[in-house]
Amino acid sequence: MEKTTRRLPIVERDEWLQPVEAQMNLRHERYERKMADIGRSAGSLVDYANGYRYFGWQWDDVLDGWWLREWLPGAHDVYVFGDFNNWQRTEIRMHKDAAGVWSAFFPAAMYRDRLRHGSLYKIHVHGDNGWLDRIPAYARRVVQDDETKNYTAQFWNPAEPFDWRGDAFDASKIGSLLIYEAHVGMAQEREGVGTYREFTEKILPIIKKDGYNAVQLMAVAEHPYYGSFGYHVSSFFAPSSRCGTPEELKELIRRAHELGLAVIMDLVHAHYVKNLNEGINSLDGTDHLYSPPGDAGYQQYWDSKLFDYGKEEVQHFLLSNVKYWLDEFHFDGYRFDGVTSMIYRHHGYVTFDSRDRFFDEGVNGDALTYLTLANRLAHDFRPSAVTIAEDVSGMPGMCIPIADGGIGFDYRLGMAIPDFWIKQLKEVPDEQWDIREMWSVMTDRLPEVKTVAYAESHDQALVGDKTIAFRLMDKEMYFHMDRASENIVIDRGMALHKMIRLMTISTGGQAYLNFMGNEFGHPEWIDFPREGNGWSYAHARRQWSLAKNGFLRYS
């Protein structure tokens, strides 16, 4: 591979990067080398990212049966078992190839009446950590037993494929993004977990009526702990079963497209849950299957496991996941969660006080290469796809086209904006707010870097924090939100609530995001069921009736 001889456009345009031109070239060359390797092995990046079409359950027309495949290079022995063989752990042995892929074949003549849609199964893995029952990494559906609370993989093969009814939604035609951040499980007013079907029937019309043109779905991939907000993923190819079936999620997306709404997935590739029973941690019995070995594979701040982005099989797994959700579920793009944690070995817990911070030994070059590949893949497979980076560090080139030497995201989250508003509300009386300071913070971005502006998201609504409405009006919201009341705190709070949003949406960026319910000043906080609150759903829901009853000022 020849070294870059021309000056990258990103460096040409930005004098600040010219002293680190060699490092910028090296970063881009790593991506180009990887693309060349993929081209030689698979022809194209789109064809390369087909792990979900090879691993897991795959039908073989020639042999008339099902293959089950799983990458477990460190395993000594692997069996598959389930209700189709009366849960006999060591009856159906899988066979290992030179690449560490274990497989078993299920002839239709023998298993047609036993291996049925909805069958439950696991793999029995003998690794360095002994014999364990595990869920395959490529499982497309995982369900929890109501009584034991144990998670089990489910063979998912509906009699008829989902009918998309000609869905060919193009997110590039909807104009400037107005994003409604939503969590399906907590979107209903009742205390409990909401469903995809309820969201489709009740919430999508609200989003459309309020003028948004995109919905960003949180907690899509399966996660064992509901209170993690979906950020401790266990099964990357399985939509959360607590909200319904894969087909019901597809119908949600199809209906959103009918309404003119793009659907963006909150994609978590920064880490994964450390649980052995539910997740992919040590799936083959080693500590370095999907993670770097030892402490390097542990995210101490989130108590979770890290991905080894430099390992080819891990890149293939994650890239296949990027394509999978676009292909199988028609998502229109991604908000990549935790990008700062991904691209730095210190996970961003430093002060970014010099240019060298973006190029020193603290940078994870493999993660940058992976993210560049992920953006290239998303846009090659779906040219209208939208990618958004959650990065607080300001890594150069994050939202610059790959061809120019950038990483290729379409947008970055304007994370300094909510921090600014919180600081103002906590420290500065509103009559002393400085309009010039507001303007400076709202417009502090490079002209070519598109920003998703937001005054608050789910982060600010969590227990221990406060929404803007609650900071402004606090306990008065409990007593004086009826239209008959006159209260200066409520009047002033509502006016500032609107002004903050007006300032943010009009000057903060090229797109705007709001978390569900915050648009009408939803009171209190989000607190998922946990032991500390008696496993209550009282604060894990949205009280839409507050804005609908006509007697309260939320409407």
Which role does the model predict for each range below?
Residues 1-63, 67, 88-89, 96-181, ...:
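The feature marks proteins involved in alpha-glucan
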Residues 71-78:
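Short proline/glycine-enriched turn/loop motifs at strand-loop junctions of beta-rich domains
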Residues 78-80, 121:
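Short beta-strand elements bearing conserved aromatic residues within extracellular beta-rich modules
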Residues 89-101, 410-412, 418-420:
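Short, acidic Ser/Thr/Gly-rich low-complexity loop/linker segments typical of extracellular
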Residues 143, 160-161, 165-179, 183-363:
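Substrate-binding/active-site clefts of carbohydrate-active enzymes
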Residues 330-332, 350-542:
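Conserved alpha/beta catalytic core and glycan-binding cleft of carbohydrate-active enzymes
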Residues 547-555:
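Short, intrinsically disordered, charge-balanced linker/junction segments flanking boundaries
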